[in-house]
Structure formats: C-alpha cells, structure tokens
Amino acid sequence: MDQAAETHAEIRDAVAKLCAGFPGEYWRKLDREMAYPAEFVTALTESGFLSALIPEEYGGAGLPLSAAAVIMEEIQRQGCNGAACHAQMYVMGTVLRHGNADQKQRYLPKIASGELRLQAFGVTEPSSGTDTTALRTTA
C-alpha cells in the first residue's frame, strides 16, 4: 500500500470512529425537529476534518482534495449527513483562490479553528436563476 492510500485509510478509520458517536437516533431526532446538527459539525471541526483543505499556514491540514473526498464519503457511508458540513469544507476554497492576503489571514484561521463557519454561497444559472432544482441541461 502506498503512503497516500495508508493516509487515506487512517483518515477513513478516524472519520468512522467519530461518526459512531452519532447514531441513527441522533439523525432521526434532528430530522423530526428540522434541526441543524451543530454537535456533529463541531465534532468534525474539532477533529480537524473540516479544515482538511486549508493550508497548514492558516491552521488547516493542507491535505489534497482526495483526502477531503474520503472524509465526505466516509461520513455518508457511516449513515451521517454530510450535507450539513460539506460547504464548510469546500466554500473556503473561494477565499483561498480569490481572496487577497489580508482576507486569507483574517478568515482562513478562523474557519480552520471553527470560530467562523462559512457555509453559504450564491448560485445563479441562466435558465433557473437561484432555483437550482429547476436547472435544465442536456448531455
């Protein structure tokens, strides 16, 4: 097994262990109450999983996209809901790619530590505006 595969196996195992603390009843209760899984997102943040893509210089792990994919895949595999946290992992990429040095220094360490949650982004499509469920496309 190569080093990258070993690292990803360790990540997968660690995510599975964390997810075991959030059984089906936790998710069913949140679903009934239409509530946000704050405890789950906090646990992922504190474990460093949601800052996987943030460079080390800003307090993240600086891992490759493949590691982030493994994290999200394992969350779903374990029966947890990655929808509540995937934006925290990926939206910061906009700041990383397009932010100036001051913005990166101001926001990325706070996102990495969990002090700031950046989980929103705007979408607009020519045929449906912001209603992505009405999007039409052809292959």
Predicted features along the sequence, with ranges:
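Glycine-rich flavin
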Residues: 24-139
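Intrinsic disorder at enzyme termini
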Residues: 1-11
